[in-house]
Amino acid sequence: MVAFTSLLAGFAAIAGVLSAPTESSVEVEKRQTIGPGTGYSNGYYYSYWNDGHAGVTYTNGGGGSFTVNWSNSGNFVGGKGWQPGTKNKVINFSGSYNPNGNSYLSIYGWSRNPLIEYYIVENFGTYNPSTGATKLGEVTSDGSVYDIYRTQRVNQPSIIGTATFYQYWSVRRNHRSSGSVNTANHFNAWASHGLTLGTMDYQIVAVEGYFSSGSASITVS
């Protein structure tokens, strides 16, 4: 996609279905290739969604590990983390991330009251999610400057159903596929620009793609 607004439309479709509550939460085996759903895998919460296009294989591994392989995938997003998340967690992630096309590696989650969808983007493929957005500020954390943005979604799917809500973004300038993210640094920086979070819902390290191909193998802790 060539515009931030069109990207967000794709994100809304992805994130809305990703975040919608399901009844598929189950404790899965140590390593298992799964279909779309949410649940727990070796002590970590996972969430995986795709739009039904062929070519995506999501596999939960041991501990906080997961792998994704995709080709001409349509929309998908999947990853592992915590339910609920916290506002001061230091999230460690490591592994490989090899996108060809439009794809993202990010800390992703939601809060309630206010209803907020948020991203801390660590790496991306050919499309920069800040394209066309209004920059509110920046924060230096974990070895890089991140640019801060806010966008709004109107009557879009969310963790409470169709709603109007804001999205908060930190986009890292120096891409990486391994490291630590001090989420408090981002949340505090957002708050200094009036971007406050409510009660935390889930918080995961997510790989997502939009009509692209690639592979990722990530471990979260």
Curated annotation (Swiss-Prot):
PROSITE patterns linked to this entry: GH11_1, GH11_2, GH11_3
Active-site residues, as the UniProt record annotates them: 117, 208
A GO BP annotation: xylan catabolic process
Entries under InterPro entries matching the protein: ConA-like_dom_sf, GH11/12, GH11_AS_1, GH11_AS_2, GH11_dom, Glyco_hydro_11
Catalytic reactions on record: Endohydrolysis of (1->4)-beta-D-xylosidic linkages in xylans
Location in or out of the cell: Secreted
Residues in the signal sequence: 1-19
Biological pathway: Glycan degradation; xylan degradation
Domain GH11: 32-221
Alphabetically ordered keywords of this record: Carbohydrate metabolism, Glycoprotein, Glycosidase, Hydrolase, Polysaccharide degradation, Secreted, Signal, Xylan degradation
Pfam families reported in the protein's UniProt record: Glyco_hydro_11 (PF00457)
SUPFAM superfamilies: Concanavalin A-like lectins/glucanases
Entry-listed glycosylation sites: 69, 92
GO molecular function: endo-1,4-beta-xylanase activity
Family under the similarity heading: Belongs to the glycosyl hydrolase 11 (cellulase G) family.
Function: Endo-1,4-beta-xylanase involved in the hydrolysis of xylan, a major structural heterogeneous polysaccharide found in plant biomass representing the second most abundant polysaccharide in the biosphere, after cellulose.
Protein name per its UniProtKB record: Endo-1,4-beta-xylanase 2
Organism: Trichoderma harzianum (Hypocrea lixii)
